[in-house]
């Protein structure tokens, strides 16, 4: 991902920052939106105490954590709540689907024996898809975007620290820079992901889906936001 480019006006990082800090964090449209979705899920009176951009979420024993675009933590009448936010304009969910990532990881392992990427992909596929990474081929329903899988893994492990609920909103900002063709491709990648991971609809109005992993209830939604930059 070109982080410098994403901090440009109208791109994901810059737009996310504006959305959650204008006029200030507490009164921002971003916080209002997250509250709205938690309330729709029955978590009444949500209030937030912590927020951090580029928040590291370790999810396995290897060195590189999942870097969340924004993490927000708080309380509700039903208990603690957590949101791990992924921001997009029309940027891809990474450059690789799983079979591409795994093929490259195996090649890297030969060149760099200390590389752990092959092990990481194998463990993620086994844990969350219940298939071997080796078995995933081009065109398979499990051949999802690698970025989305480690977004899920990092968010679950973040919730395991203290909470048992995590909301994963993918916030798509339709700025002046938004490209519909690229946006449609991202939506297809998201739809493939929720199908492969067997998320089930739990709120039709907000298009929120749910699946429980261990003791963590995971909610996910694809939220499109018109934004004038």
Where are the regions that the model predicts?
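Short, charged/polar micro-motifs that form catalytic or ligand-binding hotspots
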Residues: 2-6, 57-61, 137-145, 183
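Conserved catalytic cores of phosphodiester-cleaving nucleases, focusing on short active-site segments
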Residues: 70-72, 81-89, 151
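Trp- and S/T/G-rich repeat-edge/linker motifs of beta-rich repeat architectures
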Residues: 1, 40-53, 191-193, 199-203
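Active-site metal-binding core of divalent-cation-utilizing nuclease and nuclease-like domains
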Residues: 43-77, 91
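Non-catalytic C-terminal interaction segments of nucleic acid-processing enzymes
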Residues: 147-229
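Catalytic cores of nucleic-acid endonucleases
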Residues: 88-171
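Charged, often low-complexity linker/regulatory segments
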Residues: 1-33
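Beta-propeller domains
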Residues: 63-67, 140-144, 225-227
